[in-house]
């Protein structure tokens, strides 16, 4: 089946392309209809697509490298979940190795004796593309169980995170993760969600599943045609806030949870004004930077997370995505550009769904329709960002030859990965670790892909990296002082430069995203108007928590639905940040 995809009204300024090829390339891969089976049928169009030999040559740099860095960070996927099957023993680049799942699958066994192996998701396409459903546990105690198979004290097994107690499932010796507890932790998580009812084997097994390359053609094409990192770990074995904080501040100020131990207010405390970010370092050095977020979201996640040091730049250095696409087209990218996916309404951040367990659990009416928490929406966003950079041809400013695009994820989100996280350098910022964590070990592997004109197709970077590599690279480029001991000792990204001469635009692949069904959240004028009771994802709840912690009124309830988020954003956030 093939059909032409019409861009969503919420593409937020993504250019329609000089030749319209960018969106006309978005045809449906064979078998992506509502009833199609996943595994071999869907997403079959992984092919690179046509090359554009007719494009004029762009000037090379005086030496291999890049002048502009663009980073986009998605949500809550492990390396094995997204890229674990990128290469098998029969299709590796010559002389290369790859730390993936093939040819040997892995297993986990639950305390109840259920054994589940790693597998490719199967089933109806629209269901498959939002797995795992529901969202696994991602907080520090959950991750301890996932990595070590421990539950300590035993009573933590039946508790929510807020009720768990020390040592928060951490073993006495945390030096050798076994990666054996993902299934057991998910079983416990489902049991709590189902109020004590035992989950079925079918419900539990999704935690060990993942996508084939054919299912995620954009990620797979870019990973194969440029560089993939098979040893990139997130900064903290926990959830969103602390990992996104480490990306730009090289610390999470001792926090390992979004809201435990002080609420969302802890991220906005006055004493964090002495903890600068790499944005502050760039500003002090006279370099340019900008954070781009989706207009539908109204406020920037990054801006709020680092409000004590970035609020003064909200009007001047934060813009919506239409400005990003214009900056790319006009050759006006800053030295560093950070992109936020849409995290609240109609989200394209690739975060797994949250809410009820089954799509037909409420009065027999589907709770999740196609493209809700759908990884294809994230694929489309990456396709739009990459395609814009691929077509950037300024001869005097930023262009495809002098720009590095990095795509990665904040954390593994509780999804299985088989590689034990290594030890880490603590930030050394003098802040006591929440839940007794010493910040001396990294979190799980996450997908990470680099796109550069100076990167040979089939590049696999085996160096052990983590989120601190972004700060370390920017510091090396612009002579910045380290923020903490973590980024001071971090490796950089220059290992992706494997060519002496740049690949011209005509040698870059044309990515072909899968057909993305219309999202019922995207119409009419605003998702909140027809999806009032839809539950917010954890990142969206966190953003609402920060918004109310800063601007909310005493006693104001934390929004947990689309309608609540819409009202809160309209009331408190409408004029806080710069626009296009």
Q: What spans do the regions from the language model cover?
A:
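N-terminal pro-sequences and low-complexity stem/linker regions of secreted or lumenal proteins
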Residues: 2-7, 16-18, 25-580
